[in-house]
Design a protein with these regions (language model features):
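Positively charged n-region of N-terminal signal peptides that target proteins for export
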Residues: 1-4
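Bacterial N-terminal signal peptides
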Residues: 7-15
Length: 104
């Protein structure tokens, strides 16, 4: 039930996400084995990068106290994909709803 409510809330707030300082986002993980090694910005994938469709490239986001930079795009609207080097770490992370702070 909580997950469904968060999904509805995020769907309603997604158009305004670029103007928010804090939001709750569905987060998942990806590896170079999933999508290749080059990001949408032309960089080589690296730890500290995230894929996100609703924030501009270069935006710094903080998730669980760790800073990440948006440097890629993902196939799921409203989701933030965190790059991880190992498949095992990505599987262990799974899909989670996280508080995300957008640094301006």
């Amino acid at each position: 039930m909580r997950r469904k409510l968060l999904t509805i809330l995020f769907t309603l707030l997604a158009p305004f996400a670029a103007h928010a300082e804090w939001l709750i986002a569905e987060c998942s993980a990806y590896t170079p084995y999933d999508c290749g090694t080059i990001t949408a910005t032309g960089e080589t994938v690296h730890v500290g990068g995230v894929a996100c469709n609703f924030l501009p490239f270069g935006t710094v986001v903080v998730i669980d106290g760790v800073e990440y930079i948006v440097n890629d795009r993902c196939g799921i609207d409203g989701c933030i994909d965190i790059f991880m080097e190992s498949y095992e770490d990505a599987i262990q992370f799974g899909r989670q709803y996280k508080e995300v702070y957008i640094k301006r």
